[in-house]
Amino acid sequence: MAQRGQPWAVLLLVVAATAAVSSGQNPRGTTAPGGETFASRVVAANLGNPWEVTWGPDAHLWITERTAFRVTRVDPADGSRKVALTLDDVYQTSVQDGLMGMALHPDLLKSRGRDWVFLVSTYDADAGSGVTRRLRVRRYTYDPAAQTLGSPVTVIDDLPAHDDHGGGRILVGPDGKLYLSRGDQGSNWLANYCNAIHSQDLPTAAEIAARDWVSYQGKVLRLEVDGAIPADNPTIKGVRSHIFSYGLRNPQGLTFGPSGLLYASEHGPSTDDEIDLIQAGKNYGWPHVAGYNDDRSYAYANWSASSTPCASLEFTYTTPQARP
């Protein structure tokens, strides 16, 4: 098993707050179209690449530090911080792996026995000297007296992972289910161009029975809090699995709107970033479709299926003088 970490990046956490002040009182502020004025200030610095930032019921910011492998709580009033958890089994080598998504259970600090925090991280599943990168979700219990997270329980593990397009956002939905975004693992792209994209792949019943999650790439998953497949998940092509929607490239933003609709923000191939309304059983088209499917300069080329060995392919990049 190998474990690596990148040097910390010195990043600033900046929050924007509305304030009824004049431009003279807020020389660095920004006025929104509705007349609201936003001001910014540094709340915390020198964090290890903050990835998830969410408001907790304790009026603190809860933050995952992707390359420091920590969950840190920050008081926005004075910037004081408290480390709730440091993980020692995260594998991280690139800009899209490490300790990523975090979801606070709605019952956190409500004395209902569900002081739960869900964390998404990559790890090395190889027991030897090699590396087999995988992704898992664990549930931790928060101890308000000690202000720490403990008692980890694995919700799901052995999910495919790579060094790019990991997705990794997690939410607890209004229905009490977990929603987890999964990217296409950077396949068919840059250094990973010889890896096949699995965003359109769907599991067989045998794969689900064997807990083989190879097709869980380029998807939004929906899980029970214990990792089980919800009974009301969509049946897609005859199989019910954790898959809620598919055909996605790299959905890193995931949120529920005020009416209960689920939205995802998705990175496109250097163009066609999307805001998607995520619906049960829907196919969002990737890699055959990018954006509105109106970009005639985009065509899917599956390098892994080339008759010439993929690793020996050579690429020439040109910029046309005029576009159709």
Region annotations inferred by a language model:
Residues 11, 40, 89, 157, ...:
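A general structural-boundary detector
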Residues 9-19:
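Bacterial N-terminal signal peptides
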Residues 13-15, 151, 315:
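Generic detector of low-complexity/intrinsically disordered segments
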Residues 24-190, 194, 253-256, 260-268:
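Acidic, Gly/Ser/Thr-rich repeat motifs that build Ca2+-stabilized beta-propeller blades
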Residues 1-10:
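Bacterial N-terminal signal peptides that target proteins for export
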